[in-house]
Design a protein with these regions (language model features):
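Short, Lys/Arg-rich flexible segments
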Residues: 1-83, 90-137
Length: 137
């Protein structure tokens, strides 16, 4: 996935502070939120991936969750050689190599990343509500 920026970074810091105040397992809560946000992002990416033969759509694979120096990272990837052309668009050429047109990209990955970022705040709020229910606050 992509890095948190701006409002999401501040929201995540507020989320951690609230978890500390509740005495919750912060790392587990962060892992839960990251897993759910990545799943939401991947779902939108899959929905926006065009289906011609199904090969491109079937090649989306999860990148395992990694915790390194207190930072949590998780994502998904598509290693099919033409995935970038479908996502970003590409030029079309004639037999002599001249550009004769351009095929717009589907931007499925960007749509998924946007969905993942937008899902962060509600997921953090839901995680705090669940912890409050468990701890009796």
């Amino acid at each position: 996935m992509s890095k948190l920026g701006g409002k999401n970074k501040k929201a995540f810091a507020d989320f951690v502070n609230k978890l500390k105040a509740l005495g919750a397992d912060i790392q587990q809560a962060e892992v839960n939120v990251v897993n759910k946000a990545t799943a939401a992002a991947k779902e939108v990416t899959l929905d926006n991936t065009p289906v011609k033969t199904g090969t491109l759509k079937g090649r989306w694979a999860d990148i395992p969750l990694i915790i390194l120096n207190g930072k949590i990272s998780k994502g998904y990837t598509n290693n099919l050689y033409y995935a970038g052309y479908v996502n970003d668009g590409h030029r079309t050429v004639n037999k002599s190599g001249e550009t004769v047109g351009y095929v717009e990209g589907f931007r499925m990955l960007e749509r998924g990343i946007t969905r993942g970022r937008l899902a962060m705040r509600p997921l953090m709020d839901e995680e705090i509500r669940q912890i409050k229910r468990k701890t009796g606050f």
